[in-house]
Swiss-Prot record:
Disulfide bonds join 3-18, 10-23, 17-33, 40-55, 47-60, 54-71. GO terms for molecular function: ion channel regulator activity; toxin activity. It comes from Hadronyche infensa. This is Pi-hexatoxin-Hi1d. The keyword rRNA-binding does not apply. The presence of a 'disulfide through disulfide knot' structurally defines this protein as a knottin. This toxin contains 2 'disulfide through disulfide knots' that are separated by a short linker. Expressed by the venom gland. Its main location: secreted. It is found in: Secreted. Keywords: Disulfide bond, Ion channel impairing toxin, Proton-gated sodium channel impairing toxin, Repeat, Secreted, Toxin. This toxin potently and selectively inhibits ASIC1a, an isoform of the gene ASIC1. It incompletely inhibits ASIC1a activation in a pH-independent and slowly reversible manner. This toxin acts by binding to and stabilizing the closed state of the channel, thereby impeding the transition into a conducting state. In vivo, this toxin protects the brain from neuronal injury when administered up to 8 hours after stroke onset.
Length: 75
């Protein structure tokens, strides 16, 4: 089962948000996966669709072929 990405609904799937995200009930709205404050993706973690979530000193690197992007040291 794919994890739920940032800003997508997590109604009935509270524990399925992607790493570093938590299910949050917005006022006057439904529950969505939001970033956990202070969390960042460490080196070699997948960052597809989460380019700004890599930790300091890392950037989301698009690997060749159909491989997923990962957080890698800034060259």
């Amino acid at each position: 089962n794919e994890c739920i990405r940032k800003w997508l609904s997590c109604v009935d799937r509270k524990n399925d948000c992607c790493e570093g995200l938590e299910c949050y009930k917005r006022r006057h709205s439904f529950e969505v996966c939001v970033p956990i404050p202070g969390f960042c993706l460490v080196k070699w973690k997948q960052c597809d669709g989460r380019e700004r979530d890599c930790c300091a000193g890392l950037e989301c690197w698009k690997r060749s072929g159909n491989k997923s992007s990962v957080c890698a040291p800034i060259a």
